[in-house]
Amino acid sequence: MAGRYDSNPFEEDDVNPFSEQARGKAGGQPSYGGGAFYMPNPRNVPSMSSNSRLSPLPPEPAAFGATVDIPLDSSKDLKNREKELQAREAELNKREKELKRREEAAARAGIVIEEKNWPPFLPLIHHDITNEIPSHLQRMQYVAFASFLGLACCLFWNVIAVTSAWVKGEGVKIWLLAIIYFISGVPGAYVLWYRPLYNAMRTDSALKFGLFFLVYLFHILFCVFSAVAPPVVFEGKSLAGILPAIDLISKNALVGIFYFVGFGLFCVESLLSIWVIQQVYMYFRGSGKAAEMKRDATRGAMRAAF
């Protein structure tokens, strides 16, 4: 058995064919012609040692961190870009100063920039009771807002009830009137009495309180009239009140039930509105705004007289 460090008998000898010993082992002249590269005089070939090998090339470092030369823009292009950026910066600074100047002018004139935030899914109006109304008036304002939403709910249900009556043969005129009530009633209530009350609570203005009282009385009268719905316009069936409900319950039970529900909604809205105007009037008198309003009215009358 061969030892671990014995030579391999099948391994080829590491012999340099150009050495003298290799020529001696070959036993004389080779039997083949070398062609154009054959040298008859082997002494002209430089001698090499028998154990010499070809020296390997030195290892080259891997070019992982090598940089790639990227041609940079010329100094002229850099200057042009720098000028362009400076011009843009100057334009932005000019716009910022102009916007700041307008905001300051609006603030001096008492103009408040309001961001639309309600309803959340489709902002149409600015409404922020928590941050804009004093804490001791927020409960009153929330109830007034509930009365505004209650009016919208009443008019919407009125459209449903009148539509059911129209389908059962009561005529299209009452349906058109119900649509007019809804389309004009909700925005009109917001502009005529809810927004004045909101601004009066926020700014504590006696004049805006007076406007609210004047319009809100008509709102209460309309709710009471709608709850009764006397046969004044088109037999009163354009409003879901108690009288048309009694008349329709005998003809069609479903339509009569719709009208009775409308009657209940208008009753609740009337009671809620009466509570709101009572609370607002108590605050108005208790805060001295009533006396202030009287003084302002007297001054206005005297100026008009002179």
UniProtKB/Swiss-Prot annotation:
Residues 25-36 have a biased composition (Gly residues). InterPro entries: SCAMP. GO terms for cellular component: early endosome; plasma membrane; recycling endosome membrane; trans-Golgi network membrane; transport vesicle membrane. Pfam families: SCAMP (PF04144). Keywords: Cell membrane, Coiled coil, Cytoplasmic vesicle, Membrane, Transmembrane, Transmembrane helix, Transport. GO terms for biological process: protein transport. Residues 1-60 are annotated as: Disordered. Residues 44-54 have a biased composition (Polar residues). It is found in: Cell membrane; Cytoplasmic vesicle, Secretory vesicle membrane. The chain crosses the membrane at residues 142-162, 174-194, 209-229, 257-277. It is a multi-pass membrane protein. Residues 72-109 form a coiled coil. Residues 1-141, 278-306 are cytoplasmic. Probably involved in membrane trafficking. Belongs to the SCAMP family. This is Putative secretory carrier-associated membrane protein 1. It comes from Oryza sativa subsp. indica. The gene is SCAMP1.
